[in-house]
């Protein structure tokens, strides 16, 4: 019957949505969203190419930020909505390098993030700007409302996407879903493993989407402790 068919289609849609959300759930506890705040026992492990910056993470700094985030977003976690989320967002201006006619020139970029993370974000991009790579920024995406049922940390300004076209999101089989091609050795806009961008985020407790089962090279999110 039509009702049975619709039920099957709904089940498939729910299953597909669950799979799409699984990567962030693997790294960030589902309970954080539900205001229970019980971290999962398994933490993502550094890969073999990680260097001493992994061990330079200020755990106390992360814990203090997490406590501030939980307090700041307490109402949102109970009743998530776009209006509630946007009450906690701020715009920050950060220094960046642009590529113009093959040369790197200094500029600034504005990005909307969770107010509690604003200082961290400024420090991160100041460090990237001062790094030896002079990593060029074409586009930044911070806070983006993706629906009340979305698990994305972009909903609460705790995620940043960098140069999406050159740092694509992949499916589990390595096919590109968003963006074009990740080429860290040939494309200056592609994020390098253990480069200035990864180091600046990682040592402040942000997780790179390269760690996901479905790679998301553009993505950095402030992780749950």
Describe the predicted segments one by one:
Residues 70-140:
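Active-site acidic/histidine clusters and adjacent loop/turn architecture
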Residues 29, 65, 117-124, 158, ...:
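Stable alpha-helical elements in mature extracytoplasmic
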């Amino acid at each position: 019957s039509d009702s049975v068919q619709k039920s099957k289609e709904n089940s498939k849609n729910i299953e597909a949505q669950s799979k799409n959300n699984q990567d962030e759930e693997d790294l960030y506890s589902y309970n954080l969203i539900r205001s229970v705040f019980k971290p999962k026992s398994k933490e993502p492990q550094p890969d073999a190419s990680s260097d001493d910056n992994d061990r330079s993470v200020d755990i106390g700094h992360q814990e203090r930020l997490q406590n501030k985030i939980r307090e700041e977003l307490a109402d949102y976690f109970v009743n998530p909505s776009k209006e509630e989320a946007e009450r906690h967002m701020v715009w920050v201006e950060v220094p960046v390098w642009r590529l113009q006619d093959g040369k790197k020139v200094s500029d600034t970029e504005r990005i909307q993030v969770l107010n509690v993370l604003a200082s961290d974000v400024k420090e991160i991009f100041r460090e990237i700007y001062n790094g030896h790579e002079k990593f060029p920024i074409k586009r930044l995406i911070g806070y983006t409302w993706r629906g009340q049922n979305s698990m994305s940390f972009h909903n609460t300004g705790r995620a940043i996407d960098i140069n999406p076209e050159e740092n694509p999101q992949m499916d589990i089989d390595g096919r590109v879903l968003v963006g074009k091609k990740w080429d860290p050795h040939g494309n200056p806009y592609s994020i390098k493993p253990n480069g200035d961008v990864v180091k600046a985020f990682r040592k402040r407790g942000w997780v790179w989407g390269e760690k996901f089962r479905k790679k998301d090279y553009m993505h950095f999110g402030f992780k749950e402790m």
